[in-house]
Amino acid sequence: MDIPVSQLPSGGYGYNFPSVRIKPLNFVEIVAYMDDYPKDDIMGKYLYDLNQLIKDDENIKNCYIMDVDFLMFYKKLCTVSEDLSYQVEVKCPHCGKPIRKTISFDSDIHFKQIDEKIMNGAKIELGGHTYETIVPTVNDFMKVFNVYLRYRKVTDIKMIKTIALMKNFDLQANQIEQDVLNATHKDITLLMALRELYYDRLETINLVCTNCTKEDGGRRSVAVSVESLIVDFFRDLYINSPIDATKIVFK
């Protein structure tokens, strides 16, 4: 299926292609995915999911990471659910009862509004140095990611993404790395703000506990991160793509 770039978290800002193609995994691809997915390697997991998208459309290499993170979720969602709905069940942290909700891609998945000004980057002061920020595409990000994939000095994906926001990593790699990793006080606040601006573009989904509401009248809810929903393809397929009696007719 083709997704117009205007419907991505970036709004398609600066893209010279109108859409990207994302395909649901078929049966043999799901089996291969579950066999080959590097379960104990955080960096390997991210690279594996990224390569799955690139197989669908080479233009993914020119997409912003903020869009690619969403597309990783979208590919998994369209694999487990034909109508892009999803059954969520979490335990209420207050009463311990399960909270169940069917979320819809159209009505429940929302992006934080993008401001075109931030897409042009900014000048920042970090660790006593002045940097220009960029909005990294996959091609930009891989220049940074491949360094850490090789040497494994930093393995936290969010930290690597933060480092990738700085322009000229190829010229100032050690300085940028040190200024990000050793940030304190206001510099930490700055880096967290940059993460939210350039990566955390999906709104969380609030699930209201009806049991708590019924018992004391208070409205208690749990915030669920969209990206963390799909963890097991076959389990999620059973729940979100059930069959009825017409699918199997015994002789």
What are these regions (language model features)?
Residues 1-251:
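Long C-terminal interaction/binding lobes of large macromolecular proteins
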